[in-house]
Amino acid sequence: MTGIGEMFLAAFLQALFQTLVSEPFRSFFKRRELNENLLERLSTALLTITAVLIDAEEKQITNPVVEKWVNELRDVVYHAEDALDDIATEALRLNIGAESSSSNRLRQLRGRMSLGDFLDGNSEHLETRLEKVTIRLERLASQRNILGLKELTAMIPKQRLPTTSLVDESEVFGRDDDKDEIMRFLIPENGKDNGITVVAIVGIGGVGKTTLSQLLYNDQHVRSYFGTKVWAHVSEEFDVFKITKKVYESVTSRPCEFTDLDVLQVKLKERLTGTGLPFLLVLDDLWNENFADWDLLRQPFIHAAQGSQILVTTRSQRVASIMCAVHVHNLQPLSDGDCWSLFMKTVFGNQEPCLNREIGDLAERIVHKCRGLPLAVKTLGGVLRFEGKVIEWERVLSSRIWDLPADKSNLLPVLRVSYYYLPAHLKRCFAYCSIFPKGHAFEKDKVVLLWMAEGFLQQTRSSKNLEELGNEYFSELESRSLLQKTKTRYIMHDFINELAQFASGEFSSKFEDGCKLQVSERTRYLSYLRDNYAEPMEFEALREVKFLRTFLPLSLTNSSRSCCLDQMVSEKLLPTLTRLRVLSLSHYKIARLPPDFFKNISHARFLDLSRTELEKLPKSLCYMYNLQTLLLSYCSSLKELPTDISNLINLRYLDLIGTKLRQMPRRFGRLKSLQTLTTFFVSASDGSRISELGGLHDLHGKLKIVELQRVVDVADAAEANLNSKKHLREIDFVWRTGSSSSENNTNPHRTQNEAEVFEKLRPHRHIEKLAIERYKGRRFPDWLSDPSFSRIVCIRLRECQYCTSLPSLGQLPCLKELHISGMVGLQSIGRKFYFSDQQLRDQDQQPFRSLETLRFDNLPDWQEWLDVRVTRGDLFPSLKKLFILRCPELTGTLPTFLPSLISLHIYKCGLLDFQPDHHEYSYRNLQTLSIKSSCDTLVKFPLNHFANLDKLEVDQCTSLYSLELSNEHLRGPNALRNLRINDCQNLQLLPKLNALPQNLQVTITNCRYLRQPMEQQPQYHHPQFHLPRSNVSGSPKSHGSHRSYDSRSSSRYD
């Protein structure tokens, strides 16, 4: 199989050079007199090979000998990386040993030792390996002339056939809606300002961007609207002069004689502004992401006639962004039905398709294989054109893109260009994604962690951390349509997946259902689909794979179901794979691992043990000094971490969600590389105190701090230094009910100490989300009311049962969500909820000016919600959703004016007084209203008081007597679509349904005093009405059943 190698290998070689020129490695070579030339030999061989890599990439496509040379080079580079990694790992081990030494004198002595000192004992073996690697590289370098490889300074793109504006519309299916959507922007109903705007069509290679632009270009409305149309196929070469010249020749209808760009652009500008007619320029297949080039090209068009447009097709979202497109149309794959029509047209032309059952079944599977890609449909259909042999159809079905006949397929060249022009650092990342099975949806963060483990993220000239670089790389691939976002995850189109496999070659292997595991001695990356039980024989082939780096079981579903892994695999086979960098045993029913399981896997950077049944981790885990990622989420039996986990000084990501841990081991603060720590458990006496967080300066994302009742020393809390952790965005503070009397003590001294501790846990002002759960103090910290927390968007207060008042949160400028629940001591909400003591003097600021969701839940003693007047604006001016749930003692009314409220839910608030008459105008935008087991004073409900009400639910309102249409309002409830009434035992009056909207859904159940069933009102049966059904049950005349009636009738009319 042909592979793609040059820039892929260039990224490897760049990383190798960085290691070789680093001071520790140069010191190592200088200290060994017999090997002082080894470094120079190795560097020279690498430089010689690098010079011919560009030529090698081109020639390996058609020359099997060059392909073999490239694959041999990749294998040697992997071995070189392994050797250098051995040196770095040994240095790490000795450094950690020095730091852990109990002897200060020994620690100081070792601290002064060089890497060469560390390696004296093992240097002979390591130097022998490097010598072998150097010899292999020198041999490959010497073969460059024999293979005819030349030194090239730049990649020469292979010219593809240019596109034209012509299209055969009989061969286009399923693009009418796309065409209509883009036409709205090309020819808008309303006029536009002078100048030119850009519309972009973005999509994966082969999805039909050019075809769609051809349809638009040749549309009759487009021809009549635009005075001049120009089609320019740009491809990889963005030549401003050539494009400008072509536009000029199209506008003037004569050859261009100008050779100076400035003169040409001036002349073109004069012609465009002089005609007064809009023009259309199509730039097909645009790749250039240089804003300066685009800015130069657009200069003559800036003052073009009103309505002028540039239509761009590109695979890159970034191109569309750079060109400031007013509309970006993300072109989606065709439906299976449209693909079938195109396939039949391609295979049989204008003849009637003639398919027997066997070929018909194969045809459906081939069409499905194309996954909506028109180019793939036409390519596979073209290979089978008028082909009647079943064996040929089966061959095409099972073929991969590189297996198709070169003279009949342009699918691979079209897709390959997406890879060809990737930067070097992205090629390795993209090729690695070949380990994902077709159809597998993957998480962005996990892929970044895998790339990081494999060493693909290079910080050469960047101040960004590895995770930020990985996210940047991922976004680049997504922008280029190589990765596609679903609702929550990402996928690769099947043919892009094959392209990645094509790029990765024999170094990557997938073990999928129904396939035999195919690996070679060169295989470095392996994934397979988990099954209920993995047979040992399925993994026998791995005994020959001595240099495997990735062992990754996957699932095509998001199921959390656990599987079984044979003990032979987990305890005998895996420990022999000493070069592993990625190891996952996630979702396996593993209760224990041998004590020395990780002893020989010291190179691993990524370890996923999530959703296993492990009760404790082997101590040998603490010798994995290179480990960067440790996933232990939902290990529901795991009760403790190894004592010496602090040795993992390179650990960056530790996920402890869903474990049974109750404390962290001692010296946890030594893990200074941590970027993500999901949970920190404050220890009681023999573990890590909260002060251990103080040294973890680089924590990002979300942190949950649990067992805060164990913090009794205010100084400890201050040393946690939460206010210095500027990268944290979410913090959950959680107290628990402790088992000891001291932890349960709620005397005034104890609660005062809790408040003082919490005051010292002030987070950085960049925090965005806060949750406080089971806090045992009597007052919230002052910092919680500080308006300098300008980024907080969400606060959750749960079961803070000793607090009798809420913190002053009204002046947090960006707060959008506030959830308050389980505060049994809260009785009143008043002015201090909106303003702090200092802010009470100045009430000009609108309280809660950004709040959109407010939820009160399970506040059993809450009695009053005092209304507050402000000198400017309204309370809650942005509030959209209000929930008041399980507040049985709450009396009085709701805030009088909530102009933005669209959803109101009241549940089990019997004493709350809600009268629609009082809120008709103040809640004018209300769309959803739900009142359940609440508002005992509610007797009548005028349906037409809320003009925008879409959904009304009333359940167990004991006093409700009537739903009516108020006579003072001529309008009806025209927006109402769903009316649900249940168990309102005193309800007796309903409005005539012919006065309600025709498409209203009405459900009425268990309302026993509705005295007249709806079907007995014939005066409202008008033929022009056709309303959906109304369900009434539980009334005396419905015999207790749930019956359906035509809703053109009415219950007892008023």
Swiss-Prot record:
Keywords: ATP-binding, Coiled coil, Leucine-rich repeat, Nucleotide-binding, Plant defense, Repeat. This is Putative disease resistance RPP13-like protein 1. ATP binds at G203, I204, G205, G206, V207, G208, K209, T210. Residues 117-147 form a coiled coil. LRR repeats lie at residues 579-600, 603-624, 626-648, 650-672, 676-697. Residues 9-20 are annotated as: Leucine-zipper 1. The keyword ATP-binding applies. It comes from Arabidopsis thaliana. Pfam families: LRR_8, LRR_R13L1-DRL21, NB-ARC, Rx_N, WH_DRP. The LRR repeats probably act as specificity determinant of pathogen recognition. InterPro entries: Apaf_helical, Leu-rich_rpt, Leu-rich_rpt_typical-subtyp, LRR_dom_sf, LRR_R13L1-DRL21, NB-ARC, P-loop_NTPase, Rx_N. Residues 1043-1054 have a biased composition (Basic and acidic residues). Residues 152-462 form the NB-ARC domain. Residues 39-53 are annotated as: Leucine-zipper 2. It comes from the Eukaryota. GO terms for molecular function: ADP binding; ATP binding. The keyword Nucleotide-binding applies. Residues 1018-1054 are annotated as: Disordered. Belongs to the disease resistance NB-LRR family. RPP13 subfamily. Potential disease resistance protein. One of its GO terms (biological process) is defense response to other organism.
